[in-house]
Curated annotation (Swiss-Prot):
Keyword Ribosomal protein: yes
GO molecular function, one term: mRNA binding
InterPro entries: Ribosomal_uL13 (IPR005822), Ribosomal_uL13_bac-type (IPR005823), Ribosomal_uL13_sf (IPR036899)
Gene3D superfamilies per UniProt: Ribosomal protein L13
Task of the protein: This protein is one of the early assembly proteins of the 50S ribosomal subunit, although it is not seen to bind rRNA by itself. It is important during the early stages of 50S assembly.
Record's subunit section: Part of the 50S ribosomal subunit.
An annotated GO cellular component: cytosolic large ribosomal subunit
GO biological process: one example: translation
Pfam families linked to this entry: Ribosomal_L13
Protein name per the record: Large ribosomal subunit protein uL13
Listed CDD domains: Ribosomal_L13
Sequence similarity: Belongs to the universal ribosomal protein uL13 family.
Keywords: Ribonucleoprotein, Ribosomal protein
Length: 143
């Protein structure tokens, strides 16, 4: 009788990939990145083990959204004080913090809890074309 394979955390090899987000649609990039951060693209995927890879995203400032979402997509945050809600649309967020919209989109697609928090730490987003992870020799991933 064969037994179901269950990956061990010590046996998992985390690879490094780099994605160029120039003129890519936000949601399509985010869904592919979330899938790879979880490790669901691997045959050894195990739900309770972090089997995902490291993802480096460059040129996040050139991400685009479809339709009128650049002005209509609103991100809300609250300070915790009465009347402390603040909102910013996609265009303004990209201008001030390039890549934060992508981080928020991916974070919403990952599981909530200790394992999900460990997965989001493997995502590195940079607004420009330069990144400090060349020593890890990331492979180029085309979407």
């Amino acid at each position: 009788m064969t037994k179901t394979f269950s990956a061990k955390a010590a046996d998992v090899v985390h690879e490094w990939f780099v994605i160029d987000a120039t003129d890519k649609v936000l949601g399509r990039v985010a869904s592919e990145v979330a899938l790879r951060l979880r490790g669901k693209h691997k045959a050894i995927y195990t739900p309770h083990v972090d089997t995902g890879d490291f993802i480096v995203i460059i040129n996040a400032a050139q991400l685009r959204v479809t339709g009128a979402k650049s002005t209509d997509k609103i991100y809300y945050s609250h300070s915790g004080y009465p009347g402390g809600i603040s909102s910013v649309n996609f265009r303004d967020m990209q201008a001030k913090f390039p890549g934060r919209a992508l981080e928020k989109a991916v974070k919403g697609m990952l599981p909530k809890g200790p394992l999900g928090y460990a997965m989001i730490k493997k995502l590195k987003v940079y607004g420009g074309a330069e990144h400090p992870h060349t020593a890890q020799q990331p492979k180029v991933l085309e979407l």
